[in-house]
Amino acid sequence: MSLYLCVFVSGVESYGVDAGAYSDFNRLRHYIAQHLEDGKPGFRFPNLILHSDCEGEWRPEDCAALRDELARIIEAMCERPATDFPPGWQVALAQSLHLAPRNAMESFIDVDGEPLLVGLLGLAETAIQAGEPILFQ
C-alpha cells in the first residue's frame, strides 16, 4: 500500500508527496532513529518518528516543530554517507533517472526520484503557511 501525504487549501490539493510504500517511509524513520537518535526512536525527532502513519494527519499546530525537525535531519543526513537504495522500485527508478546519491539525505527518494525529506519539508512549510494539516492518504 502506498503512502501519499498532502496538504489541501480551500478544498484543492496544494502540495503532495508519494512516499512509496509504508515500508519505504518506515525505512527512512528507522534510519533516522538508528543513526541520528542513537537507537532511541523519538529521542531527538518525536514529531516525525513517533507519529503513527495510521493517525491520518499532522495537525497544523504540530507542523512548525515538524519543519524544524526535518531541517535538522536534512542537515545531519547531508553529512552522512550515501546508503544503497532497497531492491525493487527505488533501484529501478534510480537507474532510469541516473540517480547517484552523494549522501544519506539523497538516499531516500519519493516515487518521482526526488529526495523524500525535501518533499516532507515542503509539505510542512505549505501546511504552516496555509494553517492546514498534512494528510496521510
Summary of predicted features, one role per range:
Residues M1-Q137:
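Acidic (Asp/Glu-rich) sequence patches and key acidic residues
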